[in-house]
Design a protein with these regions (language model features):
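Short, solvent-exposed loop/turn elements at beta->coil junctions and helix N-caps
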Residues: 21, 67, 121-123
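Short, solvent-exposed aromatic-acidic interface loops
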Residues: 45-49, 100
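Charged, gly/pro-rich active-site loop segments
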Residues: 71-149
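Surface-exposed connector loops and short turns at secondary-structure junctions
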Residues: 51-55
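Short beta-strand segments
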Residues: 13-46, 63
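Solvent-exposed residues in well-ordered beta-strands and their adjoining turns
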Residues: 36, 45, 65, 84-86, ...
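Active-site-adjacent structural patch at catalytic or cofactor/ligand-binding sites
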Residues: 46, 57-66, 75-84
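Short, basic/aromatic recognition patches
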Residues: 1-17
Length: 149
């Protein structure tokens, strides 16, 4: 895939997988993401294996894909880089607002449980007033894309 195709796939999707370097084996988990000003942002809950791996500060791989059910058409991108906690209030707010917008349009409110919200929550509750951890992919060292012929 060329750079334009890679960027198109990244901008059109909203779910990815992040692979972390675990202690004895890799660890992979799904995440909602958004693109704001050319950067990828993810929401992390403040618990689970991913947090201990994130705190280690080791490089990660992010995988984004699109495919048809029979795999006659597919495309995927892998990005290698580092994850950084977003502490700037305005940057964090922009990422949260975009995640909530994507969530309202394309995801069930049930998905908010994966974000650490109680069942029955609504996307209007996903705001920068909440203790939501926003993580940015930084220092992207490699982008690889592959698509069906």
């Amino acid at each position: 895939m060329n750079e334009k195709e890679i960027e198109k796939l990244i901008s059109e999707q909203f779910l990815c997988r992040i692979a972390f370097k675990g202690e004895n084996q890799p660890y992979i988990a799904p995440f909602q993401y958004v693109v704001v000003d050319g950067s990828l942002y993810f929401h992390f809950t403040n618990y689970g294996k991913k947090m201990s791996f994130f705190k280690q500060g080791t490089p990660v791989c992010v995988e984004i894909e699109r495919y048809t059910p029979n795999l006659s058409e597919y495309e995927f991108v892998v990005l290698s880089g580092n994850l950084e906690l977003v502490e700037n209030h305005q940057e964090r707010k922009r990422a949260i607002m975009k995640m909530a917008e994507v969530g309202r349009k394309q995801l069930s409110p049930n998905f908010l449980v994966a974000h650490g919200f109680p069942q029955g929550s609504d996307w209007s509750e996903f705001t920068d007033d909440q203790p939501v951890l926003i993580i940015r992919l930084d220092d992207v060292k490699e982008k690889t894309g592959l698509k069906s012929p």
